From Swiss-Prot:
InterPro entries: HflD, HflD-like_sf. Its main location: cytoplasm. Belongs to the HflD family. GO terms for cellular component: cytoplasm; plasma membrane. It comes from the Bacteria. It is found in: Cytoplasm; Cell inner membrane. This is High frequency lysogenization protein HflD homolog. Gene3D superfamilies: HflD-like. The keyword Cell membrane applies. It is a peripheral membrane protein. Disulfide bonds: none annotated.
Length: 207
């Protein structure tokens, strides 16, 4: 993988989280593979490469890549507007989080507790989802910028769905942080669109 593709893998994580949030909000459904991939990414320490963060391959990230391609191509027929809005909001929240050492410390202390729950129940178990959702609520949801999720109120009002959405936003912001650490910047999404697409298309073909 090229350095740009490493960045795109992390950005694919941001967009996958955004797509899954949109699906839960609109349909109340989410794939266990996608949820497992994103929640698992919160708990990986010292990965040998970016793919290891997402379980060792990027099969689960395909939906995220698709949404990212739609955003970069600017084709109205493939652009997923709500996921794009959520993804950009997560990139913005990551910038605010980076300035809050106190919040980073709380997240750093509570993730190992969640790790022990994962070892006991598995990554997509409702207890793990609830713990990740509560961590988001106690930290990132207190920042000035909020992510407004739009969808069917019947889905949004179900506590389990609300927890999944918050947990996915937490995981998406973790991916945004990884993207920054790998050298990603928002201006690239505007100025380097063609270069990013050129590196992104092969990732979609790696079946």
């Amino acid at each position: 993988m090229s350095p740009t593709q490493e960045q795109l893998t992390a950005l694919g994580g941001v967009f996958l989280a955004a797509v899954l949030v949109d699906k839960i909000a609109k349909t109340g459904q989410v794939t266990e593979a996608g949820l497992t991939c994103m929640l698992g990414s919160l708990l990986i320490r010292d990965p040998k490469d970016t793919l290891e963060v997402y379980g060792g391959d990027d099969l689960a990230l395909r939906e995220g890549y698709r949404a990212l391609i739609g955003a970069l191509e600017r084709d109205p027929s493939t652009l997923q507007r709500e996921p794009l809005r959520y993804a950009l909001s997560m990139l913005g929240l990551e910038r605010q989080l980076a300035k809050r050492e106190d919040m980073l410390e709380v997240i750093g202390k509570r993730l190992p507790q969640i790790q022990s729950q994962v070892e006991h129940f598995g990554p997509a178990h409702e207890n793990v989802v609830a713990a990740c959702g509560a961590l988001y609520q106690d930290t990132l949801s207190t920042l000035r910028q909020r992510i407004q999720v739009h969808g069917d109120m019947r889905n949004l009002q179900q506590p389990n769905n609300a927890s999944k959405i918050r947990a996915l936003l937490l995981a998406g912001i973790r991916s945004a942080r990884l993207w920054r650490q790998l050298g990603g910047h928002r201006w690239q999404l505007v100025i380097s669109r063609r270069k990013l697409l050129k590196e992104l298309y092969p990732l979609m073909r790696n079946e």
